[in-house]
Design a protein with these regions (language model features):
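Conserved structural elements of the adenylate-forming
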Residues: 79-84, 217-239, 300-304
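ANL superfamily adenylate-forming
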Residues: 153-205, 214, 226, 306-308
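Gly/Ser/Thr-rich phosphate-binding loop
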Residues: 206, 264, 290-293, 307-366, ...
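Conserved AMP-binding/adenylation subdomain of ANL enzymes
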Residues: 226-243, 251-291, 305
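Conserved ATP/PPi-binding loop(s) of AMP-dependent carboxylate-activating enzymes
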Residues: 374-377, 388-413
């Protein structure tokens, strides 16, 4: 493409992004001092979790950012707690480029560890909470993180795997004590002063499914712009300062992606450590969530509840149920929308490329189970074994290009 063509394409994309972000309420009129704080945070931190919570703390200090089984946290509380945790990590010898493994379920500790890493420029490594001892050992040996943040329930597994790392407990029951430092103690008494941005932003390493052996690590840097988020919001009607129930695991690429979207929207994020179908409906209804983020098997388990239970909870506020992580059966999409309205979105993607296509409720009604179409900024091509494009209606290998693509594998089989 010629230089004038490239310029025209860039201008068009940025104009579309601006329009979408304004429509979603991410860009909105605000007090001059808060506008300045937002601009400074974006310039200093870039589009990172550290920037998002710094901005949200400035714009919505007293609004609730996280709801979990431990209670609620406002955006200002999250900002101060993650500052304290980042300082504690630094005091423990963790710095820019160092790895911090995170083995946590869905709760504030997972989020606080990720944001603290972002503030330091450290790299977050997400460990599957269903790992066996051999998988855990192999991944930790290969990735060589400097520290580990974990839930107390995994202490025995870590001890069996002989994990020799600086360890921090993110979630514990009152009667449990492994002797490791608790994050809750650090954030309650630590240094809450703002940190200086690192020279290079940290990365997130999300593990693949590991169907052929030890899960591979897929390194993912933060996107360089808001274009991918705007492209997603073009298809899924979410707006700023709404409430999202994230049932999908945060360590999974889909759960993490939607949390990233949520903090860009300054959403209130509702979490439950372990998935329970009825509890998910209850929390979604109780908090009047406008979005419920799931993987398809969660929809299946919800729909297996008896009719009386399904009718007990009012999901009238929900306008988007984004599902991803595996194939969505056609019968499942039809039954869900027949019960709860046309609010189901099916996203096809992978750990390596994030989302490739998005199916709207209209798409799913027309062709149940469809993967939909590529969002703006994503290119999907099918090629045969010789590297030639296949004709429409033919089968081929899928290639995806977008700003969310990963940088490469860290190893594994």
């Amino acid at each position: 493409m010629s230089l004038p063509g490239q310029i025209a394409t860039t201008v068009k994309t940025k104009s579309q992004t601006l329009a979408t972000l304004t429509r979603a309420g991410i860009i909105r009129p605000s007090r001059p001092d808060r506008v300045l704080q937002t601009a400074v945070a974006l310039v200093r931190w870039g589009p990172t979790p550290a920037a998002a919570y710094t901005i949200n703390a400035a714009r919505y200090p007293d609004e609730v950012g996280i709801v979990d089984e431990a209670g609620t946290l406002t955006f200002l509380e999250i900002q101060r707690r993650t500052n304290a945790l980042a300082h504690a990590f630094a005091d423990a010898g963790i710095g820019p480029g160092d790895g911090v493994a995170i083995m946590c379920r869905n709760h504030r500790g997972f989020i606080e560890a990720v944001v603290a890493c972002s503030k330091l420029g450290a790299n977050a490594l997400f460990l599957n909470t269903a790992f066996s001892k051999p998988q855990l050992t192999d991944v930790l040996e290969r990735e060589a993180p400097k520290a580990l943040v974990y839930d107390q329930e995994f202490a025995n597994l870590l001890d069996e795997a002989d994990v020799d790392l600086v360890r921090f407990i993110a979630w514990h029951e009152p009667e449990e004590d492994s002797g490791d430092t608790r994050i809750e103690d650090l954030v309650g008494t630590g240094n809450i002063q703002n940190l200086s941005p690192p020279k290079e932003p940290g990365k997130a390493t999300i593990l693949t499914s590991g169907t052929t052996g030890t899960p591979k690590g897929a390194n993912r840097s933060q996107p360089k712009s808001m274009d991918p988020i705007a492209a997603l919001l073009d298809r899924i009607p979410l707006k700023a300062r709404e409430t999202t129930m994230i049932a999908a695991p945060l360590f999974h690429s889909w759960g993490y992606a939607h949390w990233s979207l949520g903090i860009s929207l300054a959403s209130t994020v509702v979490l439950k450590r372990k998935f329970d179908p009825e509890a998910t409906l209850s929390l979604t209804a109780q908090h009047q969530a406008t979005a419920l983020v799931v993987v398809p098997v969660m929809l299946q388990r919800i729909l297996e509840l008896d009719d009386e239970t399904l009718k007990r909870y009012d999901l009238g506020a929900v306008k988007a149920v984004p599902a991803s992580g595996s194939a969505l059966p056609a019968s499942l999409s039809d039954r869900w929308m027949d019960l709860f309205g046309d609010n189901l979105f099916n996203l096809y993607g992978s750990t390596e490329v994030a989302w490739a296509t998005i199916a709207t409720p209209e798409d799913l009604r027309a062709a149940p189970g469809t993967a939909g179409k590529p969002p703006r900024g994503t290119v999907v091509k099918l090629y045969d074994d010789d590297g030639k494009p296949v004709a429409q209606g033919e089968t081929g290998r899928i290639f995806v290009g977008n700003e969310m693509a990963f940088e490469g594998y860290t190893g594994g089989g």
